A protein has these predicted regions:
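N-terminal amphipathic/basic-hydrophobic helices that include classical n-h-c signal peptides
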Residues: 1-21
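Short, basic/polar N-terminal leader/transit segment immediately after the initiator methionine
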Residues: 3-5, 24-27, 52-53
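Short helix-onset patch at the extreme N-terminus, typifying the N->h transition
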Residues: 7-8, 27-30, 214
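The N-terminal extracellular segments of secreted preproproteins, especially immediately downstream
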Residues: 22, 45-47
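Bacterial N-terminal signal peptides that target proteins for export
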Residues: 23-35
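Bacterial N-terminal signal peptides
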Residues: 34-45
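Low-complexity, acidic/polar, glycine-enriched regions of mature
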Residues: 49-223
Length: 223
């Protein structure tokens, strides 16, 4: 039962008790029932707020992956190896979800050292000047069963643009049998144009569109 449904049930009880109070002339019963009503109302308030959960991104089980066309004939793939951040999520009201995530741009890895050094250089990401990539959500919409559209501000190379993440999940929470904490997972995708972020090096050689895939695992302590 969702918090809204529990609240509605509690108010039905309150209405029934009010009707009883009106027809009951015994002071003791009136006092007892009044206390009951107060407890129900207060309990409803706490219950409605109890569903909000704060989850931490697990860097060891999260991958920020990208793909980009090379010369228009093949695709280069890689990843950033360290992602951190916080997700606030209410299972009963997914539209209230929010994300504040940071990617360590210095961990760029495409499995070719020369290329990785070039991408980290001022030619592309300039990680010495802009060591992080950040995403902060501004709006969340339920797109369907188990799917969300999360709009937010993505900052790369010192430039901030609005993007939309298509999210599958989060999954139901499970308890980690080894660590004892709770875990959920989600997958998010989006596409950006690197030129929008002031990264214009090697046109025609490196594609403009960057496909981004985020496989995220989140954790929080078990109650």
């Amino acid at each position: 039962m969702t918090p809204k449904e529990r609240l509605a049930d509690n108010f039905k009880v309150i209405e029934r008790e009010n009707n009883t109070l009106m027809s009951n002339n015994q002071d003791k019963n009136i006092l007892t029932k009044s206390v009951l009503l107060a407890v129900l109302v207060i309990g409803s308030s706490f219950t409605c707020g109890a569903e909000t959960q704060i989850w931490q991104i697990d860097p060891n089980h999260t991958a920020a992956q990208f793909s980009v066309r090379h010369l228009g004939i093949s695709t280069v793939r890689g990843m950033f190896e360290k992602t951190s951040g916080t997700v606030v999520f209410d299972p009963s009201d997914p539209a209230k979800a929010s994300i504040d995530a940071t990617i360590d741009a210095t961990t760029f890895n495409s499995r070719v050292q020369m290329r990785d050094n070039d991408v980290r250089s001022p030619h592309f990401l300039d990680v010495a000047k802009y060591p992080t990539i950040t995403f902060k959500s501004t709006r969340t919409e339920v797109a369907g069963t188990g799917t969300l559209k999360i709009t937010g501000d993505l900052t790369i190379h010192g430039v901030t643009k609005q993007v939309v993440l298509d999210v599958e999940g989060p999954s139901p929470a499970i308890k980690d049998p080894m660590m004892g904490n709770l875990r959920i997972g989600a997958n998010a995708t989006t596409k950006i144009n690197r030129n929008d972020f002031g990264i214009t090096t090697m046109p025609g050689i490196v594609g403009d569109d960057i496909q981004i895939v985020l496989d995220v695992e989140l954790t929080r302590p078990a109650k």
